[in-house]
Amino acid sequence: MREIVHLQTGQCGNQIGAAFWQTISGEHGLDGSGVYNGTSDLQLERMNVYFNEASGNKYVPRAVLVDLEPGTMDAVRAGPFGQLFRPDNFVFGQSGAGNNWAKGHYTEGAELVDQVLDVVRREAEGCDCLQGFQITHSLGGGTGAGMGTLLISKIREEFPDRMMATFSVVPSPKVSDTVVEPYNATLSVHQLVENSDETFCIDNEALYDICMRTLKLSNPSYGDLNHLVSAVMSGVTTCLRFPGQLNSDLRKLAVNMVPFPRLHFFMVGFAPLTSRGAHSFRAVTVPELTQQMFDPKNMMAASDFRNGRYLTCSAIFRGKVSMKEVEDQMRNVQQKNVSYFVEWIPNNVQTALCSIPPRGLKMSSTFVGNSTSIQELFKRVGDQFTAMFRRKAFLHWYTGEGMDEMEFTEAESNMNDLVSEYQQYQEASISEGEEEYPEEVSNEEE
């Protein structure tokens, strides 16, 4: 079967990763130590996309856990699903990256990277037919951002024809935990533009908003945020993990979603968003799911798609859903919001179905959109970057690890290019190629 190797790097990546494994273990009927006690053959059928089978009905995640300090790893190990992971797959340093991208990418991280690649290689060799890699990390820190992007480029070198998907937590405008986030994020985006095939952008602020507005949680914890992220990750990977009517793998997703190679940054959303205790009190319908899924308040990246246009998008419905109803609803959304979809890609909405709903829900839907409005997010980070870089603030932390100012300048301009590429396609229309013949057009009108 088509296996995926999962990597999680840094504190954020490991916490999101742990939540993801907890969610999908539940969906596949595995308990905290990886023993299968599920009820349906469907849970087993494509188990090997994410799990290796060990002896005695036990399944082990094909996950590599990486960090430059032992703290988060110990927390994962002590957590409810800590016994799930293979002990050899924990790779950690002792020094930490101290939120410094250069430490993760060039000094501390570079020392650890070969050790990680050995584990990755071992996992890849055990695969029947590897389809690709997915990595969870944040872009604002040192390890997830710096070392995460280093791993991506090394894996790219060694497995050039395999897919590379990233779940990247982008720094948010209001919720910031380090001053140098804009530097780390810009340097990371510079790498992701070149080396990733699909990047799902998640942003803490949008998650906070969802928790407060929709889930009515007065002070959300990181646990609540990670719960949301794991719901989306579980949704995005559904088609890979369960046999469905419209199956897909990482490559099919990319083929449908990425019209131009650099524009592979997706917004994700999930429905129904209900607070953890309340979901059992009412039934959800397909129209409600569709409406909620396309609601800007549901997007897990702080950019409003109404300020841009969708190049492509994809919706994954789970549960006992009628195909016809889904098709009708999706057509309906497109007709109502026709101005938010570019008209030069016909049929740019893709739907997939899977009959197994997530735990505790009758049906759900996950949304992945490639919208030009994601440029807001890069613009925001870029402005903060420029403000600091103009004064060369904090640069000595990076140059001290051997980085060059030139690299900052390159990263900045690459990100600005990305923003203007999105802008260009936002404004593009079908008739652009015909502007060279104004005379003929006027003749016809007479």
From Swiss-Prot:
The keyword rRNA processing does not apply. SMART domains: Tubulin, Tubulin_C. The keyword Metal-binding applies. CDD domains: beta_tubulin. Its main location: cytoplasm. One of its GO terms (biological process) is microtubule-based process. Residues 432-446 have a biased composition (Acidic residues). Its cofactor is Mg(2+). Residues 425-446 are annotated as: Disordered. It is found in: Cytoplasm, Cytoskeleton. One of its GO terms (molecular function) is metal ion binding. Mg(2+) binds at residue 69. InterPro entries: Beta-tubulin_BS, Beta_tubulin, Tub_FtsZ_C, Tubulin, Tubulin/FtsZ-like_C, Tubulin/FtsZ_2-layer-sand-dom, Tubulin/FtsZ_GTPase_sf, Tubulin_C. Keywords: Cytoplasm, Cytoskeleton, GTP-binding, Magnesium, Metal-binding, Microtubule, Nucleotide-binding. GTP binds at residues 11, 69, 138, 142-144, 204, 226. Belongs to the tubulin family. Tubulin is the major constituent of microtubules, a cylinder consisting of laterally associated linear protofilaments composed of alpha- and beta-tubulin heterodimers. Microtubules grow by the addition of GTP-tubulin dimers to the microtubule end, where a stabilizing cap forms. Below the cap, tubulin dimers are in GDP-bound state, owing to GTPase activity of alpha-tubulin. Dimer of alpha and beta chains. A typical microtubule is a hollow water-filled tube with an outer diameter of 25 nm and an inner diameter of 15 nM. Alpha-beta heterodimers associate head-to-tail to form protofilaments running lengthwise along the microtubule wall with the beta-tubulin subunit facing the microtubule plus end conferring a structural polarity. Microtubules usually have 13 protofilaments but different protofilament numbers can be found in some organisms and specialized cells. This is Tubulin beta chain. The gene is TUB2.
